Amino acid sequence: MKTKRLYCFLFTLGLIFNVACNQLSKEEQEFDALMQKVIDVHDEVMPKMGTMSSLIKDLEPKIDTTATGKSYATAQKDLKDSYDFMMDWMGDFSNKFPHGEENTTKDIEKFTAKMKMLQEEELEVKKLRDQINSSINNAKKLLEKS
């Protein structure tokens, strides 16, 4: 009977220890939540890449030397800049945060640096989202007028 209790106790203790060791720290949970926010903004604007490409093509025949034609050229340039911004951001993000890389608090200096980079990426991706949305809205308004 005592042996059975001992095994039960050791099993329970081992289970508790295993669960406790596999939990993410508060900092790691914050990192994961922030990473998800950044990815969510990316996922929001990624489908708009096709729209930007179409609008760039739609604006092309309307560009000329008149004032109206120049406004189409400006709108097209804004779309191209937004498109390039997205491509550059994705490449940069992939270099900073390679797929499959673990970001744990085991090396606190490295983790802190990664968290700071991720906070900067959150600001950058929001700027990207705003630029993409603005360039699309502007181009659509111009094309509706014509």
Regions found by a protein language model. Name each.
Residues M1-N22:
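Sec-dependent bacterial lipoprotein signal peptides
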Residues S25-E28, D32, A73, Q119, ...:
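Charge-dense, low-complexity intrinsically disordered segments
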Residues M35-V41, V45, M49, D107-S146:
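C-terminal amphipathic alpha-helix
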Residues M52, I56-A67, F93, F97-G100, ...:
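Secondary-structure edge/capping motif, primarily at the C-terminal ends of alpha-helices
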